[in-house]
Swiss-Prot record:
Localization in the cell: Cytoplasm
Protein name in UniProt: D-alanine--D-alanine ligase
Organism placement in taxonomy: Bacteria, Pseudomonadati, Pseudomonadota, Alphaproteobacteria, Rickettsiales
Organism expressing this protein natively: Wolbachia pipientis wMel
Catalytic activity: 2 D-alanine + ATP = D-alanyl-D-alanine + ADP + phosphate + H(+)
Functional summary from the UniProt entry: Cell wall formation.
Residues that, per the record, bind Mg(2+) 1: 249, 263
Record-annotated ATP-grasp domain positions: 101-297
Length: 315
């Protein structure tokens, strides 16, 4: 019997519109695969909606806080509903850039130097990192609220738009060079793509507007660096106990031959323009519909919907 699949999208975060796009793409794929799929716009009544539908699986097409930070995952576990993507712990740790950077370092994975800074210190320009630096939220995605400050003029422009500065943010060194993204699928790092944005960096517009960035696969970087992206992405995916898919983001500086890991995303963007589907297609010949089916089948076969972390291997 084919289970009913509830597609959870929308939600409360700044990434709501992206989530709705992901949800519609998944619904289209599931319809073509003849699954019984129901789209649910997540709100404060989500528990009641899920109990009424009683789906066999929840496909999480949510992004940002409440969707990929362990909140919806915890609710689904309480309700006894299987779900796609990673569990509570992996989701909560991965979205928190401070926590995840500590874990990168503990696994000997290099990451940009930085620290947590208050809104007050940003406004006073009490910043201990020289230009250029990056200012970004602790737990948002899709490059929302990310600023690259190359000069004092950039800082003044940011200060004049101070409403976008959060109470706590991360400030870290800017790594010049090449933007890299590595996909993990079913415990295999399947490939790394290079992104050359037309804007200053790979921002929201470049991520979700066709033609705003050039994608190169496989990434044109030295073989040993390419191999390192695959190794690092798989290592952190397994350490956190991520499930089915994830995407790890890196910067490579060819001038000093250094690779820095920026973050791991347990719920990467999931439209046909998104990076993980693109890598799956180019690396493995897996089209979008097939990728959706793989995620569903892998999620349904897990008897235990709780986290399966491999942390004990490193303890």
């Amino acid at each position: 019997m084919i289970p009913t699949i509830a597609i959870l999208s929308g939600g409360f975060s700044c990434e709501r519109e992206i989530s709705l796009m992901s949800g519609k793409a998944v619904k289209k794929a599931l319809d073509s695969l003849s699954y019984n799929a129901i789209e649910i716009d997540v709100d404060s009544n989500i528990a009641e909606k899920l109990k009424k539908i009683n789906p066999g699986l929840a496909f999480i097409a949510l992004h940002g806080p409440y969707g990929e930070d362990g909140c919806i995952q915890g609710l689904l576990e309480i309700l006894g509903i299987k779900y796609t993507h990673s569990g509570v712990m992996a989701s909560a740790v991965a979205i928190n850039k401070v926590m995840s950077k500590h874990i990168f370092r503990s696994l000997n994975i290099d990451t940009p130097k930085g620290y947590v800074i208050s809104r007050e210190d940003v406004l006073k320009n009490n910043i201990k990192i020289d230009y250029p630096y990056v200012l970004k939220p602790i737990n948002e995605g899709s490059s929302i609220g990310v600023y690259i400050i190359f000069s004092h003029e950039d800082y003044l422009e940011l200060k004049n738009n101070s409403s976008t500065i959060m109470e706590k943010m991360i400030v870290e060194e800017y790594i010049p060079g090449i933007e890299l993204h590595t996909a993990v699928l079913l415990d295999e790092a399947i490939g790394t793509i290079e992104v050359r944005p037309k804007n200053k960096f790979y921002d929201y517009e470049a991520k979700y507007t066709d033609g705003f960035a050039e994608h190169i696969f496989p990434a044109k970087i030295p073989d040993n660096i390419y191999k390192m992206t695959l190794e690092h992405a798989l290592k952190i995916h397994q350490f956190l106990g991520c499930k089915t898919i994830s995407r790890s983001d890196f910067r490579y500086n060819p001038k000093n031959n250094t690779l820095k890991m920026l973050e791991i995303n347990t719920h990467p963007g999931f439209t046909e323009l998104s990076l993980v589907p693109e890598i799956a297609k180019l690396a493995k010949g897996i089209n979008f519909n097939e990728l959706v089916k793989i995620i569903i089948e892998d999620s349904l076969q897990h008897k235990n919907i709780r986290d399966l972390s491999h942390v004990e291997q490193y303890y």
